[in-house]
């Protein structure tokens, strides 16, 4: 597919337990060495799907660095930039929209946040990567992963559409937290490689 080498067999397992925890597990093998970087692109609005813009909801990311992008095509430069002193600092919980309109080149490229964060604890074990909280509902969501990165996307390109119960969904009505290898890692030597060798299991 899309000229990637090999024939890959992939499996995704979704598990919902009695505590309301959702687990997503990926497994893949390929008969040739190829690139494997699976993620999840679910949209969240912790105040409910009919609550409109989610910018008042709060987010904490366990990441001291992020990967700036070259331009609006969102390909990382290869740099790991400190979040400290920038609108990208979510190390302490803050409203997602607090700095989203800041005069910042990176935010202008994406029309908001659509950037990968380098997780502070990325040793291959399951770690708490993010915590989000609804502004009105008080619902709290924790995100755990064994990946090295997490992409924050603030729904900047959601176009008006009719959703559940006839509710109109629009720009920034939801956000995504996508655990992953860093984008374009296959071309950046200082990023952890997403290459899956033939016969190995992802």
Q: Where are the language model's segments positioned?
A:
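An exposed, glycine/acidic-rich loop-and-rim segment of catalytic or binding clefts
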Residues: 1-202
């Amino acid at each position: 597919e899309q000229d990637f080498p090999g024939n890959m067999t992939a499996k995704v397992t979704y598990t919902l337990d009695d505590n309301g925890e959702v687990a997503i597990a990926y497994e893949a093998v390929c008969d040739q060495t190829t690139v494997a970087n699976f993620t999840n692109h679910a949209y969240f609005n912790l105040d409910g799907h009919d609550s409109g813009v989610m910018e008042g909801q709060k987010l904490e990311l366990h990441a001291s660095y992020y990967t700036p992008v070259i331009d609006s095509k969102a390909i990382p430069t290869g740099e790991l930039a400190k979040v400290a002193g920038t609108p990208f600092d979510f190390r302490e919980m803050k409203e997602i929209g607090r700095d989203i309109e800041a005069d910042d080149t990176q935010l202008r490229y994406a029309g908001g946040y659509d950037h990968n964060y380098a997780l502070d604890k990325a040793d291959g074990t399951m770690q708490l990567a993010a915590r989000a909280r609804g502004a009105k509902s008080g619902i709290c969501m924790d995100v755990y992963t064994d990946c090295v990165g997490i992409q924050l996307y603030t729904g900047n390109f959601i176009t008006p559409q009719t959703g559940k119960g006839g509710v109109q969904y629009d720009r920034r009505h939801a956000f995504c937290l996508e655990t992953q290898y860093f984008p374009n890692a296959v071309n950046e030597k200082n990023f952890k490689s997403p290459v899956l060798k033939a016969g190995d299991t992802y």
